């Protein structure tokens, strides 16, 4: 069962890594040709995402280590540690760095976006690839969401850190590319690079917001959270027996994914 979960979670990670490598290469080519602030931010975003997926694969390998005297419950929580590192990288290297780069161009909008239609083509290519990766993540969420929870509740209660990260990254990638497309079009038709720089700032803020959400979730999992609401109800229902007059209190902790 655990092996099946690991394979499922890692499938979305590998799909996202492949997508981000392709998209990162195309975005850097687009930035080199156009000088677009939004394209630079998107390029940084994709490189950070590639590093994040590699960290998740490392964490998954460490989490699969066998039980030992030193770690009698295994090392599965290593996933949460690496996931927290990923959230920090997404905030600082992806979001904060991108905001700083774009803000510089926002207040000094002397740059011009060149080869606009080539940039648009690269952004559309990236949008298609990232959408495919996002569909893989959504498919895995549906497979794991056996209780039929809403998407928001599933994300809040899920103990599958790799799924949370990939869904957040792919969602930000799709939204970020749409923002970059909008900024590039506005800059082209108004001949004003302000909109390109503004879209870069918005993309950076989007990444910072996603990183903070992920960091909050993984911090809780790393220090220890109770089981999900539905699992707790199942545990309590097991005590609904005639020989038990009253259930006073139940304390639980989720040890690992």
Per-segment meaning from a language model:
Residues 19, 32-65, 103, 164-178:
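Acidic (Asp/Glu-rich) catalytic motifs at the cytosolic membrane interface
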Residues 45, 71, 248-251:
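Histidine-centered active-site/metal-ligand motif
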Residues 8, 22, 33-35, 51, ...:
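Residues at the start of alpha-helices and the adjacent loop-to-helix junctions
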Residues 5-15, 44-57, 81-94:
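Alpha-helical transmembrane segments of integral membrane proteins, especially early/N-terminal helices
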Residues 1-26, 31:
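Topogenic membrane-insertion module of multi-pass membrane proteins
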């Amino acid at each position: 069962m655990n092996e099946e979960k690991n394979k499922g979670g890692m499938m979305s990670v590998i799909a996202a890594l492949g997508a981000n490598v392709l998209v990162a290469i195309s975005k850097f080519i687009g930035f080199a040709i156009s000088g677009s602030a939004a394209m630079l931010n998107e390029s940084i975003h994709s490189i950070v995402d590639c590093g994040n997926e590699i960290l998740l694969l490392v964490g998954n390998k460490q989490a699969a280590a066998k039980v030992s005297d030193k770690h009698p419950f295994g090392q599965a929580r290593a996933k949460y540690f690496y996931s927290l590192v990923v959230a920090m990288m997404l905030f600082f290297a992806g979001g904060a760095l991108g905001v700083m780069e774009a803000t510089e161009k926002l207040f000094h909008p002397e740059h011009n976006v060149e080869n606009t239609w080539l940039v648009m083509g690269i952004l559309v290519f990236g949008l298609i690839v990232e959408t495919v990766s996002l569909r893989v993540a959504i498919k895995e969420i549906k497979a794991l969401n056996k209780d039929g929870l809403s998407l928001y509740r599933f994300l809040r209660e899920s103990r599958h850190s790799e799924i949370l990260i990939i869904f957040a990254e792919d969602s930000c990638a799709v939204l970020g590319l749409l923002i970059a497309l909008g900024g590039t079009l506005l800059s082209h038709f108004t001949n004003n690079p302000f909109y390109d720089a503004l879209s870069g700032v918005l993309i950076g803020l989007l990444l910072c917001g996603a990183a903070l959400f992920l960091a909050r979730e993984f911090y809780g999992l790393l220090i220890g959270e109770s089981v999900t609401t539905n699992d707790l109800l199942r545990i309590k229902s097991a005590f609904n027996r005639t020989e038990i007059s009253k259930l006073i209190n139940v304390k639980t902790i989720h040890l690992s994914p």
